[in-house]
């Protein structure tokens, strides 16, 4: 697809090809469009079927490391399935068409993540990935998925955006980024692509809730309560991830701290 | 099933759509494409184009809501992933048809009031029947309603609109070509995936047949409403096409569609060919998945 034409709506003095040169309404229309999504993903998906460059040699993993990677990827699949089902349910809840179209792009992103992780499991010799995912899923991430889908089923848009686009995306962003540094080359490339998507999803959550809370400051208390409730599940999921990734004891608190700081940095709850 | 579903993966979708027939397009058409001045400057054609585009938006909004709802209901990951691509396809359709309304001069702040004003109530009821199935968590009925009935109707209507726009409005015709390619994929998934589920759940047949009959009734009622109001715009469109052809020193050409000469057929004939074509498609597609097509009553 070609570059979208942004010039007409751009403010004087700003680069008219940059979304940030647009007024607020035009900005949202632009960054939540199919065209914007495609241009964003094109850069890091082009030439990477299944999330990595096909010529990349697959490292020989020792059996223990391979087992750990399979368990880790199975739990990533639970998180991505939660994100996929959550995001798809949220399309109907979105308060306007721009948000609805953005959520549709997120649905496709989450489905792609699920697909590339399942494909990687297949490459690692897992013959029935769906069964393996069920077998190896940690209770905390499964419980988080149920909680998220309950919020979606209840039609609670703000809480669902918070649980999915802030908490779950931050958890995944933190764990995937950490894992990408130590993973085998193919898994690392897959994770880098996924992290690029998560960044966009986080941006949507931060922006949507930030704007909402300006007009509805009392809703902050409710979101803090939800966070308090879900944090224990997130920490449980992180605990599971520690073991799967084979982290040393000294490194473990760092990942939890990274997650909490990442949520804090969004500034939604402060 | 696994092999067939591998043809509906995100990877395949990326290669076929954004990196395939949508490459080098903006809002579904070539960059720089615009609505023809003969349409924008003609009050009758402009209003008719706005009304038509609103029906497309209403249908695609329903498809977006339904396909996203079906992701959660799908029984396996592969179907969820396909429905995720369909969700994004439908969102793209909402976006490109909404953009067309803006290209036709509808102000952004008037979008919803324009949709409310022109959306046909029978089409809205058609959509509600489908969305009720999705809300009830009925995956099989939802996919039949969405991927066979709604998509089957959209596919045929888009083909008709594409045939009538090819000469006068290449920009809109190209936009429609991309959506037709999408709809073809959606209908294919519906047929392939649901056949096996229907044979596993034969008790669902009766309910699904009633849904198809009811949706078909409201589809025919929509066609009847739209065509009964379109005589003037069809005649005006033909006059403009003839004038343009005369200016270019040729004739308007033969726009034939399913045996009907779109340049001379009466509005009633075109409506009849459209209805017969859609219902014929329903009959053969439903037959392939083991559902017996039910003739709807004819709207008054």
Where are these regions (language model features)?
Chain B
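Non-heme di-metal
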Residues: 1-300
């Amino acid at each position: 697809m070609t570059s979208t034409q942004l010039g007409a709506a751009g403010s004087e003095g700003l680069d008219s090809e940059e979304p940030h040169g647009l007024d607020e309404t035009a900005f949202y229309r632009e960054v939540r469009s199919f065209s914007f999504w495609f241009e964003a993903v094109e850069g890091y998906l082009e030439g990477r079927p299944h999330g990595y460059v096909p010529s990349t040699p697959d490292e020989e993993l020792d059996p223990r490391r391979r087992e750990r990677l399979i368990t880790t990827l199975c739990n990533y699949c639970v998180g991505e399935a939660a994100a996929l089902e959550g995001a798809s349910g949220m399309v109907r809840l979105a308060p306007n068409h721009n948000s609805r179209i953005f959520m549709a792009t997120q649905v496709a992103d989450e489905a792609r993540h699920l697909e590339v992780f399942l494909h990687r499991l297949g490459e690692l010799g897992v013959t029935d990935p769906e069964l393996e995912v069920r077998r190896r899923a940690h209770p905390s991430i499964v419980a988080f998925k149920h909680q998220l889908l309950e919020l979606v089923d209840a039609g609670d848009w703000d809480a669902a955006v918070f649980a999915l686009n802030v908490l779950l995306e931050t958890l995944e962003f933190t764990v995937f980024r950490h894992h990408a540094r130590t993973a085998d080359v193919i898994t690392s490339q897959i994770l880098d692509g996924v992290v690029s998507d998560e960044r966009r999803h986080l941006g949507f959550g931060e922006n949507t809730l930030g704007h909402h809370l300006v007009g509805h400051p009392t809703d902050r208390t409710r979101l803090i309560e939800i966070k308090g409730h879900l944090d224990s599940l997130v920490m449980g999921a992180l605990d599971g991830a520690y073991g799967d990734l084979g982290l040393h004891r000294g490194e473990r608190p760092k990942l939890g701290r990274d997650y909490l700081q990442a949520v804090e940095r969004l500034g939604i709850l402060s | 099933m696994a092999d067939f579903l591998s043809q509906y993966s995100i990877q395949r979708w990326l290669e076929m759509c954004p990196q395939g027939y949508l490459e080098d397009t903006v809002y579904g058409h070539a960059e720089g494409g615009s609505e023809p001045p003969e349409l924008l400057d003609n009050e009758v054609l402009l209003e008719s184009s706005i009304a038509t585009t609103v029906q497309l938006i209403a249908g695609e909004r329903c498809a977006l809501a339904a396909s996203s709802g079906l992701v959660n209901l799908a029984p396996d990951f592969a179907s969820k992933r396909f429905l995720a691509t369909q969700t994004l396809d439908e969102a793209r359709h909402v976006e490109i048809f909404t953009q067309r309304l803006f290209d036709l001069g509808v102000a952004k702040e008037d979008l919803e009031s324009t949709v409310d004003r022109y959306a046909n109530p029978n089409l809205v009821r058609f959509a509600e029947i489908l969305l009720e199935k999705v809300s009830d968590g009925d995956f099989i009925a939802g996919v039949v309603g969405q991927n066979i009935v709604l998509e089957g109707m959209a596919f045929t209507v888009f083909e008709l609109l594409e045939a009538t726009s090819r000469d006068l409005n290449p920009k809109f015709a190209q936009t429609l070509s991309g959506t037709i390619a999408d709809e073809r994929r959606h209908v294919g998934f519906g047929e392939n995936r649901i056949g096996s589920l229907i044979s596993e759940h034969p008790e669902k047949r009766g309910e699904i047949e009633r849904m198809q009959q009811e949706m078909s009734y409201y589809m025919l009622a929509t066609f009847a409403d739209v065509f009964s109001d379109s005589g003037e715009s069809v005649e005006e469109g033909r006059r403009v096409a003839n004038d343009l052809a005369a200016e270019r020193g040729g004739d308007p050409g033969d726009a034939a569609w399913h045996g009907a000469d779109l340049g001379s057929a009466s509005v009633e004939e075109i409506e009849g060919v459209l209805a017969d074509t859609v219902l014929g498609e329903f009959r053969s597609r439903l037959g392939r998945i083991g559902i017996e097509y039910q003739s709807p009553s004819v709207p008054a």
